């Protein structure tokens, strides 16, 4: 495992759409492992592959309940809304209030290639939406309603 460089600010990779992962192999496993180590080292709760310069649909999240790894994640259901302050490892020093769904259901693949569904509320819902936005070149600053 290795700590990877987190892309920041105006790095163009942060604005690009990520590609679907076709094959889950040792390279994807290494990417997941490195992303987890990088996220923990940076004291983050989530990290998307574009943040480490890889345009693949891969995210990792840990809001204190254990690590979640998702490949090709997609939001399949959103319920309600919540507003809270967000920050981002790729935008150090920036924060702002962002409206997100209160509850989300996300479908994706785990590292074994098995389809899984995760339902998140509160911080987990927010983190899932935030990291999936990264896969589409969207930053939380695009959605700030109040700084």
Curated annotation (Swiss-Prot):
GO terms for molecular function: metal ion binding; peptide deformylase activity. Binds 1 Fe(2+) ion. It is an enzyme of class 3 (hydrolase). Fe cation binds at residues 88, 130, 134. Coiled coil: none annotated. It holds the Pfam family Pep_deformylase. The keyword Transcription regulation does not apply. It catalyses: N-terminal N-formyl-L-methionyl-[peptide] + H2O = N-terminal L-methionyl-[peptide] + formate. The active site is at 131. One of its GO terms (biological process) is translation. Keywords: Hydrolase, Iron, Metal-binding, Protein biosynthesis. Its cofactor is Fe(2+). The keyword Hydrolase applies. Its EC number is 3.5.1.88. InterPro entries: Peptide_deformylase, Peptide_deformylase_sf. SUPFAM superfamilies: Peptide deformylase (SSF56420). Belongs to the polypeptide deformylase family. PANTHER family: PEPTIDE DEFORMYLASE (PTHR10458:SF22). This is Peptide deformylase. The lineage of its organism: Bacteria, Bacillati, Bacillota, Clostridia, Peptostreptococcales.
């Amino acid at each position: 495992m290795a700590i990877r460089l987190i892309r920041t600010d105006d790095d163009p990779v942060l604005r690009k759409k990520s590609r679907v992962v076709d094959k889950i192999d040792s390279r994807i496993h290494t990417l997941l492992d490195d992303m987890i180590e990088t996220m923990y080292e940076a004291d983050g709760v989530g990290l998307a592959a574009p943040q480490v310069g890889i345009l693949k649909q891969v995210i990792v999240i840990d809001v204190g309940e254990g690590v979640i790894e998702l490949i090709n994640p997609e939001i399949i259901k959103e319920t309600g809304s919540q507003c809270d302050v967000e920050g981002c490892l790729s935008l150090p020093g920036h924060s702002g209030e962002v409206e997100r769904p209160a509850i989300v259901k996300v479908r994706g693949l785990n590292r074994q290639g098995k389809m899984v569904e995760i339902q998140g509320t509160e911080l987990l819902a927010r983190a899932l939406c935030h990291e999936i936005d990264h896969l589409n070149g969207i930053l939380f600053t695009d959605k700030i309603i109040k700084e």
